């Protein structure tokens, strides 16, 4: 059975990620583990760690429900605010075949601006596939 680590936050409900998951499920039995980094919820120059964790928890709960409704075997966790550290933490003691990094498009994505895909590829031994959402989540856009 193939195993996938999905790392995402604002894009966990994107059609692009849903399609990538469907494609992997179509190749045979698969399990997914979702990590939602507790990235800061920006309100001007400050942010609140509790608010960041609460937003990440809400996104994780929605994603778990969505994955399960599509027939996926899935688990998940809230991770460190840095997506690279969150990924490395999630990989400790867990074997996966591929990491799916779900991001916003260039110009909007802080993760791409921080070069997260390259940093991940340099720090882990698992293939990393970047899934770029064409839009921001509706729930996030309203926040």
Language model feature labels by segment:
Residues 34-58, 140-143:
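Acidic, proline/glycine-rich short linear motifs
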Residues 122-123, 127-131, 139-143:
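Glycine-rich, aromatic-bearing surface loops/beta-hairpins
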Residues 70-98, 143:
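Structural beta-alpha unit
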Residues 53-61, 114-117:
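Short, surface-exposed alpha-helical segments at coil->helix boundaries
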Residues 1-47, 126, 130-133:
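Small/aliphatic-rich secondary-structure junction motif
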Residues 102-119:
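Glycine-rich, Arg-bearing micro-motifs that act as flexible, cationic patches
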Residues 16-17, 43-48, 88-89, 111-112, ...:
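Short, well-ordered secondary-structure micro-motifs
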């Amino acid at each position: 059975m193939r195993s996938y680590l999905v790392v995402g936050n604002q894009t966990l409900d994107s059609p692009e990620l849903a399609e990538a998951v469907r494609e992997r499920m179509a190749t045979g039995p698969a399990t997914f583990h979702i990590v939602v980094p507790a990235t800061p919820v920006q309100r001007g120059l400050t942010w609140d760690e509790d608010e960041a964790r609460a937003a990440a928890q809400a996104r994780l709960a929605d994603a778990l429900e969505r994955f399960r409704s599509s027939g996926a075997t899935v688990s998940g966790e809230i991770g460190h605010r840095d997506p690279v550290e969150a990924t490395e933490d999630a990989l400790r003691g867990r074997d996966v075949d591929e990491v799916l990094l779900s991001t916003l498009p260039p110009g909007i994505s802080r993760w791409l601006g921080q070069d997260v895909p390259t940093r991940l590829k340099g720090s882990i031994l698992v293939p990393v596939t970047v899934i770029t959402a064409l839009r921001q989540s509706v729930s996030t856009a309203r926040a």
